[in-house]
Structures are given as structure tokens and as C-alpha cells.
């Protein structure tokens, strides 16, 4: 669930702000201050994250109803909570990465393409061997290696990147052209 939910988040988050430029609403929205635009994108980011996280919840809940999968002493509810937390970090990481790449390249196709290439690299055996437990997808090995919690390092790195990026480099969330004039009253 973790890798595929993050792949889905690449598609859901790709036009989070760039949609305003494509639909020619950018000049109207540009009249607002940069902080208002960043707040708008953060709200959209949260709603998109929540939607993909709910899809992961439904998917994993259906899986647990079909397969009674007690691993060791961990019950299904604990597995569900751990999986949703881990998947939520991956969704936020790849969503943020996609938004930033689309804004840097100013092209949705190129931004999504680079994000998908990074997803393939991290989700491959090469990525697992290079980054080991620092890989954001190291959680996939959690249930196969007798509840090894070394995957938390990769999730913490992903969460720190997203939180640091959304607070310190918050202007990376929007594509801000300077040629449109603002009219303040």
C-alpha cells in the first residue's frame, strides 16, 4: 500500500497550484499576497493528502477483513495504525516533492516525470540496497523481517523534509511570477 499510495499522490498533487496558471485564473489569484497563496496551497495540500490517506485506509481495511494477518503479537488494529502513519508520511513526501518539482520546472509533465523516476529509484532493489533503512519505502520490509523497526529512520527523514520545506521554504509551494502587478487599496 505504501509505494502505490505515494505513486497516486504524485498524480493527485501535481497540479495543486499549477492548475491556476493552466486555467488562466493566476492573474486574479496573484492579486492576493504571497502568504495568502501559500495558505491556499497548504489547504489544498492537506485536502489532497487526506483524500489519498482515506483511500489507503479503505484499501488496507478491506485487505485486513479478507486476510486475518496476525504477525507475532501485533493485532490488526495496531498494524492498521502503523501502516496509515507510514503511508501518510510517504504520501506527504511525494506530494510535496511533486509540487516543488512542478513549480521549479514550470511544466507538469517534467515535474511528474522526475518525481516518478525518484519513486522508481527508491522503490527498486537498487534504492533499497543503497539507502537501506533511510529509504522512505523501507517500511515494506517491516512485516517480512519479524517486525524490524529500522524503517522509522526513512519515514522520519521524509517527515522532516516535508515539515522543513513547508515551513522554511514555503515559497517553493507556489509558482510566483513577478510580472503581474498587484493593486493594494
Model-inferred region functions:
Residues 1-16, 41-108, 146:
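Secretory targeting signals
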Residues 29-37:
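Short helix-to-coil transition segments within interhelical loops
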Residues 1, 109-185:
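Terminal transmembrane helical anchor/hairpin motif
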Residues 25-27, 45-60, 157-168:
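N-terminal hydrophobic signal/anchor transmembrane helix of membrane proteins
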Residues 15-25:
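Membrane-water interface of transmembrane alpha-helices
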Residues 22, 36, 106-107:
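A helix-boundary/kink motif common to multi-pass secondary transporters
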Residues 26, 38, 109-110:
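Secondary-structure boundary/capping residues
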Residues 28-29, 101:
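Broad structural signal for hydrophobic residues in well-ordered alpha-helices, predominantly aliphatic
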Amino acid at each position: 500500500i505504501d509505494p502505490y499510495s505515494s505513486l497516486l499522490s504524485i498524480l493527485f498533487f501535481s497540479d495543486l497550484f499549477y492548475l491556476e496558471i493552466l486555467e488562466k485564473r493566476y492573474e486574479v489569484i496573484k492579486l492576493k499576497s504571497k502568504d495568502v497563496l501559500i495558505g491556499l496551497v497548504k489547504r489544498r495540500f492537506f485536502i489532497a493528502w487526506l483524500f489519498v490517506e482515506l483511500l489507503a485506509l479503505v484499501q488496507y481495511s478491506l485487505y485486513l477483513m479478507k486476510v486475518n494477518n496476525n504477525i507475532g503479537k501485533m493485532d490488526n488494529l495496531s498494524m492498521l495504525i502503523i501502516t496509515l502513519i507510514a503511508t501518510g508520511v510517504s504520501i506527504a513526501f511525494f506530494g510535496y516533492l511533486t509540487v516543488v518539482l512542478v513549480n521549479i520546472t514550470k511544466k507538469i509533465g517534467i515535474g511528474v516525470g522526475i518525481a516518478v523516476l525518484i519513486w522508481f529509484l527508491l522503490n527498486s532493489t537498487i534504492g533499497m540496497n543503497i539507502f537501506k533503512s533511510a529509504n522512505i519505502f523501507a517500511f515494506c520490509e517491516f512485516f517480512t523481517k519479524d517486525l524490524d523497526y529500522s524503517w522509522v529512520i526513512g519515514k522520519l527523514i521524509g517527515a522532516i523534509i516535508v515539515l522543513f520545506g513547508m515551513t522554511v521554504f514555503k515559497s517553493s509551494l507556489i509558482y510566483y511570477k513577478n510580472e503581474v502587478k498587484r493593486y493594494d487599496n
